[in-house]
Amino acid sequence: DGKIVDVFEMPKMAVGKKNKSQVNASQIFNEIQKAIEGEDKTKVIAVIEQVSAMPGQGVTSMFNFGQSFGVLKGIFSAMQIPMDFVSPVKWKKFFNLINTNKDASRTKAIEIYPYFSSKLSKKKDANKADAILISSFYYQNAKY
């Protein structure tokens, strides 16, 4: 029915001594499991932003980014949750967010889903707002 059941920050954990981090796959699994508890599993779908390399991004940064993407795909595959992918240009164009600042997506998400406003109260919550809008775009445009 297009219901967005939850949104949370990507769990991370420290790696090594250089203040680096990586996604915490176990915690991602736990968060997803908790979010879909009691839901009809046949109606659950993971919508992931299909991103690619960005100009000026270093090799290590791109490797870590790709690794995180792969972790998500692996978790959803293991949980037998179907996935679909949405390009940034498509969802941003749909919500009229092309060439806007990062905070514009937070404002748009709060306007559409005011019940998530407490989870989007800080500027650093723009990534969660993006996730909400990606899900909303998918629901409004997907051909089931």
Where are the regions that the model predicts?
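Phosphate- and other anionic-substrate recognition elements at nucleic-acid/protein interfaces
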Residues: 1-144
